Amino acid sequence: MSNQVLLDKLDRTTETLSNTLIHLAKLSDIEFGGKDTEQPRSSSGLATVSSSGVQMSNNYTMQLIKGIQDLLVITRSIREKWVLSQLPENEELSMFESEETLENCRKLVQESMETLLNDMP
């Protein structure tokens, strides 16, 4: 997947999670008799609200879990793409760099040895 596709999917999933959390908050306000409900409810009305509230809570909770799982998959894909983009594309280039580093180390060792040998009485 391209980066743009992953970012679009991330935006959609985040929006879905946000909406689901809003629905759960509204549902909990309805279930517990929000601030603007001044009328006492009958027992049959409470049972209806409770059973439908449980179903809706379950549905929204499942949506949250699915959304979080999607976010984990998306972020993992983004991290993997980022890590893979950090690796050198050409093995010859990395071999050349390692040979150059090795040559620099050899020069440093040689210079150090000469300095040590020259300083000895």
From Swiss-Prot:
- Which terms in the GO cellular component ontology are assigned? mediator complex
GO terms of biological process kind? regulation of transcription by RNA polymerase II
Sorted keywords for this record are:
Activator, Nucleus, Transcription, Transcription regulation
Look up keyword Nucleus and say if it applies.
yes
GO molecular function (one): transcription coregulator activity
Its localization reads: Nucleus
Predominantly, its location class is nucleus
Q: What does this protein do?
A: Component of the Mediator complex, a coactivator involved in the regulated transcription of nearly all RNA polymerase II-dependent genes. Mediator functions as a bridge to convey information from gene-specific regulatory proteins to the basal RNA polymerase II transcription machinery. Mediator is recruited to promoters by direct interactions with regulatory proteins and serves as a scaffold for the assembly of a functional preinitiation complex with RNA polymerase II and the general transcription factors.
Q: How does it assemble?
A: Component of the Mediator complex.
Protein name listed in UniProt? Mediator of RNA polymerase II transcription subunit 22
